[in-house]
């Protein structure tokens, strides 16, 4: 029984973000469709070859996506919302982009599909929409075309397909209500057709992803798996693939399925290998996800070897990444600025492929010498002075309940804040960032490269902040922001100014569509050596009589959007960050900043996948936010912002944050999210987003008024704020001005109504 290795998927964007550049060039009309398709072909060929050269036996095909793999699956099934459909029913790459970006075939605006987090990762998928009586048919053959491509290049392939039950679970019903699970029998024929086509091509194994099997699914969804896979069996061998959690709670359901193998995440799950071996059919292949696909740390391969060695020779075994390497940067070797010691602790996607090759070879030969050599740096790290800071650990241990309590309850604070700011009804504001123009990005890049001295850089940033203030005053906004010209990314910026973080040059990972992020890495205890945001906030406030918000990224979001340490708990990291940012709140307040926004868009996405684990997480997540904010005086207004959120199941925790104002993303869901706040009788102020900043569409005054009137049916108008869904960093100034002008006009109309 020779052990083989494989990956569940590979990053799509390219080492230099070639896919992003090609997409954006095509969207701007500066490149042809053939240019775009050629970039995709080049990236796929390169990535297959790189994995093969690194020692991967079976290459994933179908993991590449032009925007998102769930959206690709929707097109495969012919599931295109009516507003995005071509008149002749055909589907092309522009159809796909219209769904993701919000356009009708005519070029007119049409709402983009809703976007939400892919399980508990930082990747976003486009939510499939289902309507009653919907028809499905094989419409988009990208998977088959790419399999042909890989086979022509001589590769051993393992096609990747999002499974039918998970696909339905991830979607939403639109229009008349019905049970979306009832569509299962309608999509299965398309899946069968795809598997038949793959079998014709000589494919032996298909990776069919069913990550929903790690969740606490309703019984009727669990029961749907057996008939679904009964219908799909017989064409090719199916590797039922799960990730992000363990499968033990649903193992009885899984073991009864007519598949030939199971992939389990042995990094994030608590599954016991011996129990899996005992309970799974003896003729099944077990794919052991031993190398973490969603972090940057080098694996201790001696530990991984020990974890799996007892079942070697007892069943067919593959070793694999825990999940797709989509969530990891591509190649550590191009990182030339990382300190040698720190660099020795890391492994990116290509290095993880190398780890899988080392592990496979050791398990096949029994010789662990290379594993021991590979693991030595990560073992030495445990004693590094770069990791431990006694002062931080002491401060964390001294936290009391008082440290997370504001001085007075909300009602008293609200009165103090009204007296201080005297804002009109329907106060208008934005979420924080303004367009990051080529000029701004060039300024930061020149400074970073050493082509610009600090004085010239600061003069340039000050000018952009001044412009942002002038623009906002001209538009008539009530509460202003400085625009964040100095910030490349809302998490990276703070990480750069906190001890305990390091940064990469090319550690890009895809967030959604063409958007990539470069998460910082938490390598040690976190502290703040000096104030971070105070100087620019103070400068912006000096330019206007209107209040300017101080802008902080909250502790849970910094944690969730960074690559965390693996040697301490997430709670410990979050509270260390909270203590550092608590000092920033105190310094902003002392500098005369009266409104401070602490963004926590990631609070919900950090939830464990199993509901039974939620309470413990929410308890420390809320406490971290409160530690961060509670130092503020009563007349300092604390705002928070959240996006991509379903709130109804965590309303207690949202209220427990005790923020004076919460702004939320609601426009894509047509204010549906406010229902949660209404039912809960949420006591504090709320700013429901009135337009979608992920789309270039400019909302009309009437559209915004209609949304605000809808909001006022659920939340008393005196507690409503008016704002976009999210920051405006990715937009251009022309559409930003137009959209905000309409937003301000809508608020003014409502004040006069």
From Swiss-Prot:
It comes from the Bacteria. Its cofactor is Zn(2+). Its EC number is 2.1.1.14. GO terms for biological process: methionine biosynthetic process; methylation. L-methionine binds at residues 431-433, 484, 599. L-homocysteine binds at residues 431-433, 484, 599. It is an enzyme of class 2 (transferase). The keyword Transmembrane does not apply. One of its GO terms (molecular function) is 5-methyltetrahydropteroyltriglutamate-homocysteine S-methyltransferase activity. Keywords: Amino-acid biosynthesis, Metal-binding, Methionine biosynthesis, Methyltransferase, Repeat, Transferase, Zinc. The active site is at 694 (proton donor). It holds the Pfam family Meth_synt_2. 5-methyltetrahydropteroyltri-L-glutamate binds at residues 17-20, 117, 515-516, 561, 605. It catalyses: 5-methyltetrahydropteroyltri-L-glutamate + L-homocysteine = tetrahydropteroyltri-L-glutamate + L-methionine. The keyword Signal does not apply. Binds 1 zinc ion per subunit. PANTHER family: 5-METHYLTETRAHYDROPTEROYLTRIGLUTAMATE--HOMOCYSTEINE METHYLTRANSFERASE. Belongs to the vitamin-B12 independent methionine synthase family. Catalyzes the transfer of a methyl group from 5-methyltetrahydrofolate to homocysteine resulting in methionine formation. This is 5-methyltetrahydropteroyltriglutamate--homocysteine methyltransferase. The gene is metE.
